[in-house]
Curated annotation (Swiss-Prot):
UniProtKB keywords: Activator, DNA-binding, Metal-binding, Nucleus, Phosphoprotein, Repeat, Repressor, Transcription, Transcription regulation, Zinc, Zinc-finger
InterPro entries in UniProt: FOG (IPR039746), ZF_CCHC_FOG (IPR034731), ZFPM1/2_PR (IPR049361), Znf_C2H2_sf (IPR036236), Znf_C2H2_type (IPR013087)
Free-text note regarding domains: The CCHC FOG-type zinc fingers 1, 2, 3 and 5 directly bind to GATA-type zinc fingers. The Tyr residue adjacent to the last Cys of the CCHC FOG-type zinc finger is essential for the interaction with GATA-type zinc fingers.
Zn finger (CCHC FOG-type) start-end: 235-268, 571-604, 677-710, 811-844, 968-1001
Principal localisation: nucleus
Gene for this chain: ZFPM1
Biased composition regions of type Basic residues, renumbered to the chain: 1-13
Protein name as catalogued: Zinc finger protein ZFPM1
Length: 1006
């Protein structure tokens, strides 16, 4: 019994016959209503409007008037009897009102809710002129006779209807156009096309399948339909899941579901995605507008170039390739941003080829020019073909060009490794290289996941080798990783698979590569995903060579045969990189970069090499000049220059940490780089006369750019410092330091074992207020070089506090093998020393060591010169002095003016007197002191003559005419003989000689 009958108990009193008669009348009325709805010329009853009164009273039984006297004037709709099945949606229910079947909403219906699809059509008919009242011009034709849409009354106007039936995609849809409250009756309006309404989800009928809409549901433009047909035939991989609304393809169904749930643009659309697309308002068109041809994307781009960039998001094309790690990018800006990863911004070094730049802009320009290529058609790793998708194959010409470049870059071994004959043509195509490495090698991880009838091209990896290693054959042992061959039958068209070579060991781990292989060391760096899990990537050796090139330039002489020592393989080299200086292997290259920048023992001066490398260096007698006895204390004189780090590294040994360095307690500027960096408030570099705003910048300058960065810390005996005084007798130093590269670059070089200079010439200036003068006025003040066992090899800094016995100094040029005066390089120490002693025109005469040191204003920073100063001017700077300023006169005046008396002296004498202790390990060595810089008032006391500059400052270089003989009459003082450049200004010439002269070229290569 319905709720209507329960609310009116008087209806229960009716007899069973009356109830059956009423039901028959209702059924007849419902069938009559259906006939009127389906008849072409039958007008819609006026009761279609919910608010209009019913035209006919409901038929009743003969006893009806008596029983219905107390009812309301307007009867309420009656729910259909339970015997009638309801096949419509759950939100609606059928009711009978005024003898007509109506549809009532059970719940509140929001605008845009749709039901469908239904099989049928909407036909248009012409209204008859004899009709007295208006009738709808459309007729609803349904295939299903029992469809609930037939019971919906049709409204004459859109204002009267709250739902509409429209045709879309060969089917009928019923959509709510106005909000319908719960219990409201529905009235429908037939339309040919759907109206624009906000998008809402579509409710499918239960009888319809829940599979995605077929492809013909999409309404495409002609060019979009053409593109869709091409894609339908091109995509043969069944594992690709496309989003029809966004045009994005996914290789995982879970990714597609997540996209549809959270990111899809049509997730709030109504009807099908095509309906939501057609409901959008048309956008303004521009003259040069380009529309994306991909289905359902329809993104408008203002220009053809922007459309090309946008199309890469659909095709996966990444034309900009980083040649260092073979990463591909869609835009040039992204690739340039990525290139910054491969640089060391502190030292301005390119991690790939070792290029050193003074400015960041030059370094970035180098990276973009040499290590980035634009290769159209390159595919990124994300969009590389899958297991069932055929990979792109290189045409024969591209393969040949790739082989040509590979042969030119890596030499004959690379060609033999690939199994292809090397081509002698030097013309290279870097785009072919990027296409081969990026498009082919990146397809390997996805291609190996499953089989396919058409195999892709075999993977290929690049190996960088030096040209000087022809004897190292690419042989793989049984325990070494094999070639990364795909697990499929190779096609005859596919190129031969490349073999991943095991890495060659470093020739001399503590030394730099030979000059011939500097251009190829680290030219390419393969990422980890190119190799299989068992392969040994070449990143370790490449990065090791780069670090050796940058930080160990001075250690070339550690092994004369460095080029021929690479005979072993590295079968168990793990992925990542290895720091050969610290004996640490990193699994991540980024960790290796951080280690090299912040923690590596080789980040300081090139003299700092780990002591662990000493046993691998050649023996000491091979490094020492002939005729000098070997030092019996082997641990104290390391055979290789790499051992000099033991003292500079801080506490390399327990003795060093306990006893400390000889100058640890003083503030002498001659201490090591670590002593200068210990003071966090220190920002002034006195060697270069540069003040920095931050201590970190100062530290970087001292490590990589300072003029004294190659100076080894001086050795001093562990003797108690004597009181400062002008008459302190200088004692011969048992271990004088090796003359640094910067000091002996263009100066007159002296031979080892010369007699010491006279003691009066080395008395320190009494007026010097330097804080370290007290500790430096002892026996360590004299720069004498006495022969002894210390002349065998370089200085062992870790043992310098324990050397009280006198001994001969080490060879003056033990760590240097290039004569900058003659521009000749030597690969052995013996040949270099013989050249400097007998053949070099810049070498001083045999008795030059007995002469006092004079200061050259043209050599930074006021460097002392032993021997004939005028001869040094002539050989090093191309200066010719006139007759009044003869060499003997200057030398005759020099010893007399170097006494402790502060009396006025000639112009050239104050500089030798003040620079002598600096050359002989006095209180004024190369390195700046940890304490504050000297005050301006103290400078005149050290150098009494007003024309002379201060002894510790580089400002004297700016006024060479006052500290040297008068300007020459011939004007040659503004001409640089080495660079063949004439200068119009003397200050410009001095700046050139100090910073830019070609004589500094060897020093800038770290």
């Amino acid at each position: 019994m319905s709720r209507r009958k329960q609310s009116n108990p008087r209806q229960i009193k009716r007899s069973l016959g009356d109830m059956e008669a009423r039901e028959e009348v209702q059924l007849v009325g419902a069938s009559h209503m259906e006939q009127k709805a389906t008849a072409p010329e039958a007008p819609s009853p006026p009761s279609a409007d919910v608010n209009s009164p019913p035209p006919l009273p409901p038929p009743t039984s003969p006893g009806g008037p008596k029983e219905l006297e107390g009812q309301e004037p307007e009867p309420r709709p009656t729910e259909e009897e339970p015997g009638s099945p309801w096949s419509g949606p759950d939100e609606l229910e059928p009711v009978v009102q005024d003898g007509q079947r109506r549809i009532r909403a059970r719940l509140s219906l929001a605008t845009g809710l749709s039901w469908g699809p239904f099989h049928g059509s909407v036909q248009t008919r012409a209204s008859s002129p004899r009709q007295a009242e208006p009738s709808p011009a459309l007729t609803l034709l349904l295939v299903d006779e029992a469809c609930w849409l037939r019971t919906l009354p049709q409204a004459l106007t859109e204002a009267e209807a709250n739902t509409e039936i429209h045709r879309k995609d060969d089917a009928l849809w019923c959509r709510v156009t106005k909000p319908v409250p719960a219990g409201g009756l529905l009235s429908v309006l037939l339309t040919a096309e759907p109206h624009s309404t906000p998008g809402h989800p579509v409710k499918k009928e239960p009888a319809e399948p829940t599979c995605p809409a077929p492809a013909h549901d999409l309404q495409l433009l002609p060019q979009q339909a053409g593109m869709a047909s091409i894609l339908a035939t091109a995509v043969i991989n069944k594992d690709v899941f496309p989003c029809k609304d966004c045009g994005i393809w996914y290789r995982s169904e879970r990714n597609l579901q997540a996209h549809l749930l959270y990111y899809c643009a049509s997730r709030q659309g109504t009807g099908s995605p095509a309906a939501a697309a057609t409901d959008e308002k048309p956008k303004e068109t521009y003259p040069n507008e380009r529309v994306c041809p991909f289905p359902q994307c329809r993104k408008s781009c203002p220009s053809a170039s922007s459309l090309e960039i946008h199309m890469r998001s659909h095709s996966g094309e990444r034309p900009f390739v980083c040649l260092i790690c073979l990463s591909a990018f869609t835009t040039k800006a992204n690739c340039e941003r990525h290139l910054k990863v491969h640089t060391d911004t502190l030292s301005g070094v390119c991690h790939s080829c070792g290029f050193i730049s003074t400015t960041r802009d030059i370094l970035y320009s180098h990276l973009v020019t040499n290590h980035m290529v634009c290769q159209p058609g390159s595919k990124g790793e994300i969009y590389s073909p899958g297991a069932g998708h055929p990979a792109t194959k290189l045409p024969p010409d591209s393969l040949g060009s790739f082989q040509q470049q590979h042969t030119a870059l890596q030499g004959p071994l690379a060609s033999a490794d690939l199994g292809l004959a090397p081509t002698p043509s030097p013309g290279l195509d870097r785009k072919a290289l990027a296409e081969a490495t990026n498009g082919e090698a990146r397809a390997e991880p996805l291609a190996q996941n499953g089989g396919s009838s058409e195999p892709p091209a075999a993977p290929r990896s690049i190996k960088v080798e030096a040209v000087e290693e022809p004897e190292a054959a690419p042989i793989l042992g049984p325990g070494e990783p094999g070639p990364q061959a795909p697990s499929r039958t190779p096609s005859p068209r596919s190129p031969a698979p490349a073999r991943v070579k095991a890495e060659l060991s470093s020739p001399t781990p503590g030394s730099s590569p030979v000059p011939g292989e500097l251009g190829l060391a680290g030219a390419l760096f393969l990422p980890q995903y190119v190799f299989g899990p068992d392969a040994a990537p070449p990143a370790s050796e490449i990065l090791a060579k780069m670090s050796e090139l940058v930080h160990s330039r001075l250690q070339q002489g550690a092994g004369a045969g460095a080029g021929g020592a690479q005979t072993g393989l590295f079968p168990g080299a793990p992925k990542g990189a290895t720091c050969f200086e610290c004996e640490i292997t990193f699994s991540n290259v980024n960790n290796y970069y951080v280690h090299k920048r912040l923690y590596c023992s080789g980040r300081r001066a090139p003299e700092d090499a780990p002591a662990a490398r000493r046993p691998k260096a050649p023996p000491g007698p091979a490094r020492a000049p002939p005729g000098q006895p070997a030092e019996p204390d082997a641990p104290r004189s390391s055979p290789g220059p790499g051992a000099r780090e033991e003292g500079a590294g801080g506490a390399a040994t327990p003795e060093d940490g306990a006893g400390g360095r000889g100058s640890e307690g003083s503030q002498s500027p001659g201490s090591s780089v670590d002593d200068a960096e210990d003071d966090p408030s220190r920002t002034l570099c006195e060697a270069c006369n540069i003040r920095f705003s931050r201590h970190e910048t100062y530290t970087v300058h001292k490590r990589y750019y300072c003029a004294s960065r190659h100076d080894p810390p001086p050795r001093r005996p562990a003797a108690p410092p004597g009181p400062p005084g002008p008459a302190a007798p200088p004692a011969p130093s048992p271990a004088a330091p090796v003359r640094t590269r910067r000091r002996r670059k263009l100066y007159e070089l002296h031979a080892a074992g010369a007699p010491p200079p006279p003691p009066p010439g080395h008395a320190p200036a009494p007026e010097s207020p330097r804080p370290g003068s007290g500790s430096g006025s002892g026996p360590g003040l004299a720069p004498a070089r006495s022969p002894g066992p210390a002349a065998d090899g370089p200085i062992d800094l870790s043992k310098k506090p324990r050397r009280p016995l006198p001994g001969a100094p080490a060879p003056a040029l033990a760590d240097y093998h290039e004569c900058t005066a003659c521009r000749v390089s030597f690969h052995s120490l013996e040949a270099y020393l013989a050249h400097k002693k007998y053949s070099c025109p810049a070498a001083p005469p045999p008795g030059a060591l007995g002469l006092p040191a004079a200061a050259c204003p043209y050599c930074p920073p006021n460097g002392p010169v032993r021997g004939d100063l005028l001869e040094h001017f002539r050989l090093a700077h191309g200066l010719l002095l006139g007759a009044p300023l003869a060499g003997p006169g200057v030398e005759a005046r020099t010893p007399a003016d170097r006494g402790p008396s502060p009396a006025p002296a000639p112009a050239a004498s104050p500089q030798p007197g003040s620079r002598g202790p600096r050359d002989g390990l006095g209180p004024e060595p190369q390195e700046p002191p940890p304490g504050p810089p000297p005050s301006p008032a103290a400078a005149p006391e050290a150098v009494p003559p007003p024309p002379a500059p201060p002894s510790y400052s580089d400002k004297g270089v700016q006024t060479p005419s006052k500290g040297t003989p008068a300007p020459l009459p011939n004007g040659n003082h503004r001409y640089c003989r080495l660079c063949n450049i004439k200068f119009s200004s003397l200050s410009t010439f001095i700046a050139h000689k100090k910073y830019y002269c070609s004589s500094h070229a060897a020093e800038h290569v770290k």
